[in-house]
UniProtKB/Swiss-Prot annotation:
This is Multidrug efflux pump LfrA. Disruption phenotype: Disruption or deletion of the gene decreases resistance to ethidium bromide and acriflavine and results in a small decrease in minimal inhibitory concentrations (MICs) for ciprofloxacin, doxorubicin, rhodamine, norfloxacin, isoniazid, tetracycline, ethambutol and rifampicin. Increased accumulation of intracellular ethidium bromide in the presence and absence of a proton motive force. One of its GO terms (biological process) is response to antibiotic. SUPFAM superfamilies: MFS general substrate transporter. Signal peptide: none annotated. Keywords: Antibiotic resistance, Cell inner membrane, Cell membrane, Membrane, Transmembrane, Transmembrane helix, Transport. The keyword Cytoplasm does not apply. The keyword Nucleotide-binding does not apply.
Amino acid sequence: MSTCIEGTPSTTRTPTRAWVALAVLALPVLLIAIDNTVLAFALPLIAEDFRPSATTQLWIVDVYSLVLAALLVAMGSLGDRLGRRRLLLIGGAGFAVVSALAAFAPSAELLVGARALLGVFGAMLMPSTLSLIRNIFTDASARRLAIAIWASCFTAGSALGPIVGGALLEHFHWGAVFLVAVPILLPLLVLGPRLVPESRDPNPGPFDPVSIVLSFTTMLPIVWAVKTAAHDGLSAAAAAAFAVGIVSGALFVRRQNRSATPMLDIGLFKVMPFTSSILANFLSIIGLIGFIFFISQHLQLVLGLSPLTAGLVTLPGAVVSMIAGLAVVKAAKRFAPDTLMVTGLVFVAVGFLMILLFRHNLTVAAIIASFVVLELGVGVSQTVSNDTIVASVPAAKSGAASAVSETAYELGAVVGTATLGTIFTAFYRSNVDVPAGLTPEQTGAAAESIGGAAAVAADLPAATATQLLDSARAAFDSGIAPTAVIAAMLVLAAAAVVGVAFRR
């Protein structure tokens, strides 16, 4: 029989103050989503200003997610102990200040340092918002609606990021994309202390710095190893880092199991709705983030759209996702969570398979249609899974539970880009036909990626450039079909996990 996650019966009206508090809590979610996408558009201008090495340029992009993923579990547990609102406000203030520093960074190295600090403060924001919602909204129906609104803000931010970034970069210095954080976070810092009630674990136990270090040395090496292997191939350094992460993880689990007051209660993973929802999110995000990354390149490098126009192509899907997330709140009163999650995940898989169907004529209209179906499924499945995650654990542990959920999201994004990227690149390299007469450096760059081919083509005679670009675009599109199939299989695997686990 399906498991339903229950909350306080819907007999009392949620006070207006709670909904105003939700509006305040939505601000950092909107910011993080925007921040995840705008840097990609600013990177060419940053490279033009600082002329960083390829390694430094990768660190500008990657260091934020490395630090964020490494600290999420520790920050979630810290919020349970020190107070979730307090941690949220510290994170908001720090994120705003460091964003301003990043905007005016005088060198690439200082920008890397600022991005690392943004990862520290960003790790304080996301778990705090979701766990505070869990404690503010005790009524099950109101909580589902609140989480749907919370999730829709993330979707809206992801859609607005390319649009905001494109608009700012057309008129201002690249630092403007970092300054976006300041006006978004200012209302949080002013209104948060007045409108958002404090909550914490009433019996948190002693502070455990050893567990914090172990959680950090688990996540950081693993994420770094996956990213490094994706960029440079498997190496001894990546393998060693991965091994360090696995050993640290084993020591972390052992310490938590032996502690009377663990930083992360490993027993949470015995709750099947919690664990299956986490795993489903992880698998679906691998497919979603990895595949969206390549579709955005198709829009810009194959179809020739500007970053701003490419961002607008994804907007209809984002709107549908928000509507679906809000609509599923009513459906949750009639259908079990696993039924809704599986239905949503199937829609996501169908969206991927539509890309496969249109692969020989992947126009803007075809991409919009596919993304509308895909994002409809995302809106349903993510809203229900996030509600299930926070509702299936005690309120006192909601910070740690939210942190685990966010960690799964970050890991899924990293693994998705890395694994699907490797597969996609392999298809590109095996199908691209580089014209004769190019220098070894030009041949290597053109054979590496479609972006490299476009850069090389800019310095070639018109006929040779056209020949190279036609071949590069065809080779790029050859990877779309297998990537779509793999993404669909991952999402269907997530649906199977939910369908089986909820019936145990």
